[in-house]
Amino acid sequence: MINGINHVTWNVENVEEAFRFYVNVLGLKPIMKSRESAYFMAGSTWLAVVKGDRREDTGYDHTAFDLDRSDYDKTVEILRKREVVQWKKNESEGDSFYFLDPSGNRLELHCSSLESRIEYGKENWEGDVEWYI
C-alpha cells in the first residue's frame, strides 16, 4: 500500500543554485549537499536534486507541495517578490500556484486535499472517467 510520497528526485543544471532556492526561497530543511546532489526535507517527504541534463518539455510533470490555506496568499506574494516564474494558471479546484525553480523544474503550491479533488472531479469531469473509490 502506498502511504504518500517517499521522495522526489529532479535533475538540475546547478546544484548550488538549486540548494539556495529550496532553502532560502521555499524554506526547506537541508539534509545534505555535494557538488553532485543535495537533499532536503519538505514536511515528512524528502527531495533530492542531482546534477544532470534537463528535458526540454515536461508537459504537466510537476511536484505539488501541500500548503495551509491561511499561508497561501502570503507565500505566493513572497515568491512573486523573489521573481519566481509562474508556468501555469490554476484551472482546477483549490488554490494553486504553479512556478519554476531555477533549473526549470515545475512546482506547485496546493491548498486542497485529495478528498476535495475527488469530490470536484465526480461533480465536474465527464467522459471516460473511471472511479475506483
Language-model regions, residue ranges each:
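Short linear motifs in intrinsically disordered
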Residues: 27-32, 66-70, 85-90
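Conserved short beta-strand elements that form part of the metal-binding/catalytic scaffold
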Residues: 29-61, 69, 106-112
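N-terminal beta-strand motif that seeds the catalytic metal site of vicinal oxygen chelate
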Residues: 1-16, 63, 119-133
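Amphipathic alpha-helical segments
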Residues: 14-29, 75-79
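Short beta->alpha linker loops
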Residues: 14, 35, 91-94
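Vicinal oxygen chelate
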Residues: 5-12, 54-78, 81-133
